[in-house]
């Protein structure tokens, strides 16, 4: 390109411009499943350093811990948050075809939101990466395209890095084009004066591009082809969480118990236990029917003339109506609804929601059939179970209803999808026995045998919920077409199975990867033009509703906490009586309620709701504020007892240890070897004479220094 004439240089620039235009105007492929009613626009969050606002066009190349160049502006208390609505960062170049005079309006977030903590997902994962190059990409690309938007999922980081490479190559080509155009006829003496600045800039961009390519190649070369890109984020988040929980387990005995509970419940950790012996009398019989069902043949069917206003008979109908006025609001007091509805909160709330959304008319659901089914369904929730009863189902269903109505999701989902989400939330814990999946597996229960230890309770809830439709006058889907019915069943199954808490980290990683990938590739537009993307959002929506207790007003949250702990303690008592090891947080003599809630918020609820808030920004900001306030309340209630403090270096038999897979163990060994080699090299470098240390040839690469020497 150095010998291009004026005409050829202009033609090359024109080709480059057309190429960039085609790249920026790339349209999404035609839908594979159905056309979405409206795409979701993901608003990008920016964390800007006030000291750098004047020079936002300049790329930060200052050394940082473990980084050769800046890839992330870590959130600190002094940082101010900015939201970019339908616009681009201040670093957008004027030549970028994606920029326009109408874009780029920066809106400062309200003050209460600016100081909110970030979840553990934004912490460094460098201690667990496979190579020094990978270690240089702990977070997002601070590029002109993305400003300082924080990106933490590996696949989105790869895409962002490749876009930076493309931008650099385009800039190099543009410089060559401009240089050729200015050079004019060969032999023009003035052209030599323009070369040095272009060469300096070109060398800088070339080195930066090589660095980006090296990191992308490293990520892609270590990607296991049989796993999805979402698993890259899932594995990364699990490694970070394991490290955080290990630190927590070293602080105290109660911290150790909280760590073990979170790991076993939300990380799908399998533990080996000694199962009780099965005697001849206890030997399970062949099963041909769903257990736990009763009253299918002689249900108390209602007639259309006798259907109460809210589906339940109550002498406090007016008070109930007043309470249900808050059905569309976050934080409905379902305990009060239960009192006013004769302990039928699920029936009253679902009946009210279906009327509010006009679903009875849309799907031709007879009111008496709906009321009969809901009463039958609620009757199969166990009133003697402290937490997983019809109160919880009603709360999750109402929370799902409110989340579906969030402005960011307006007109996104079809009526059938909304019906499926509400139905899934209503049945998601029906016939729950008040014990965990692991308890059923450990006790060789009938349900565990029937469902082969895989999402035992979730499969059972689905079976019961659908089986009840076969009772007399209970088929609320009788007027759906065969195609609609199959589609609804598929969605409900996917959503209820996703409420298995052992799948939490995979759900979270997939959602965060989706959100960040769309930020990088589509200017924040999430089209949801296929079933996989749409059901992923719905799964996370119901999962958020299922884990919404910490986002509710504190009086409600405390009642839910009391109930879940009572259920845990009941399971612990049963385990103690059966001679089994007591599950984490189920021993009423040692469990710390306050620490359990702080740990649950820090490592489970906060990362999930933070990611959901990114998807629907700014609609969930108040929920995050409530979550933070509730965490601080429980944190303030943790007893400061000296007897609870233990030696962090203790190695007692009750200390929780994370089990590593064979693959993770090999990675740990490789990291230890690399760290030892790097430490030895660093020591040799430090022993060199000062003159050699000042020499560029003798000095070690900053990226090769051990971690401790890079931290500032």
From Swiss-Prot:
Active site: 388
Annotated Basic residues bias: 17-31
Binding sites annotated in the UniProt record for Zn(2+) 2: 429
Regulation: Inhibited by rolipram.
Binding site for Mg(2+): 429
Cofactor remark: Binds 2 divalent metal cations per subunit. Site 1 may preferentially bind zinc ions. Binds 2 divalent metal cations per subunit. Site 2 has a preference for magnesium and/or manganese ions.
Modified residues (Phosphoserine): 73, 641
CDD domains: HDc
UniProt feature, compositional bias: Basic and acidic residues: 48-64
Binding positions for AMP per the UniProt entry: 388, 392, 429, 546, 597, 600
SMART domains reported for this sequence: HDc (SM00471)
Pathway: Purine metabolism; 3',5'-cyclic AMP degradation; AMP from 3',5'-cyclic AMP: step 1/1
Protein name according to UniProt: 3',5'-cyclic-AMP phosphodiesterase 4C
Organism: Homo sapiens
Species lineage: Eukaryota, Metazoa, Chordata, Craniata, Vertebrata
Gene label: PDE4C
